[in-house]
Amino acid sequence: MPRSATLVIDAQIGSMGGAYEGSSVIKAINKTISKVRESSGVVVFIQHCHSSYEPLMKDNTGWGLHLDLDKSPEALVVEKESSDSFYETPLDDLMAENDVEHVYITGIQTEYCVDTTSRVALSKGYSVTLVSDGHTTGDSHILAQAVIDHHNKVLANLAHPKSRIRVAPSDEL
């Protein structure tokens, strides 16, 4: 029977520190995790391994998953080095092994790993929901809220011959 998965992208101690509305986003991620678990889905925590950015170097304190995430022993963990959570990782194989057809995308950073993973998941044939209140970024030359709003709109309107990315808040999943 087809299942769903929550992908929690890079919600690590070192990346969530300066995140816009970080605690609210963690709550939305946990809500999404709970919904997927209730329907016998799977949860995948994806951790970015960075070779030169110390907070995300493997096994540093900042590399660990955010302490407020609803983790459980049965959750899957994937390590990546790219903005694409599927690139040279076992993620696609794990999805196949668990009969996953639908993915809920959450995490950080909206304009990098969240965006890229959403697009790649769609191209790989998954049904994709971007949790609109479950992803974030930090302020840069563009305010974080503007980046989030922009990506929610762009990804919802992305052209694809077989499917679209659904964008919905955690309360409407």
Locations of regions flagged by a protein language model:
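Short acidic, Gly/Ser-rich segments with clustered Asp/Glu that frequently serve as metal-coordination loops
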Residues: 12-17
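Glycine-rich, proline-tolerant flexible connector loops at the mouths of alpha/beta enzymes
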Residues: 50-54
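Active-site-adjacent betaalpha module
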Residues: 2-5, 27, 31-34, 56-173
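A short alpha/beta connector and helix-capping loop motif
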Residues: 20-49
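Generic enzyme active-site microenvironment
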Residues: 7-8, 45-46, 131
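Short, glycine/acidic-enriched capping/hinge loops at junctions between secondary-structure elements
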Residues: 18-19, 55-57
